[in-house]
Amino acid sequence: VNAHVYYSLAEGRSGLAEQWLGRVFLNPPYGRQVIGDWIDKAFHEHKSGSADEIIICINNATDTKWFARLWDASLCFVQGRIPFWGAHGTVFVYLGENNEKFSEVFSEIGCVISRTDGDNRRIECKV
């Protein structure tokens, strides 16, 4: 991912402790004990206005407590598997105002459930 700033625990910088600015790509650690903290942080940074747009690459564990909050965002359920560790498929989550653009781009790789207006949703699959 082409980014201006990287946060990595290996480098001693936790993204949970930093303010996120502008456009953010998040691939959080998938441990059960911490993943909810990362989801909460993403929603907080977006709602505060610090992060304009956030894309989260995460496993599609729709049966988990932390995933329930993601239904408030636009989602792309990737068709097929991205070769990561683990048995789940992948979901890209979008927090931002460009839901139509997210749907246009990400429907090329999976089925997108995007917010339209209010509580309305649109489903688009090109694959």
Tell me the role of every PLM-derived stretch.
Residues 1-127:
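Class I S-adenosyl-L-methionine-dependent methyltransferase catalytic core
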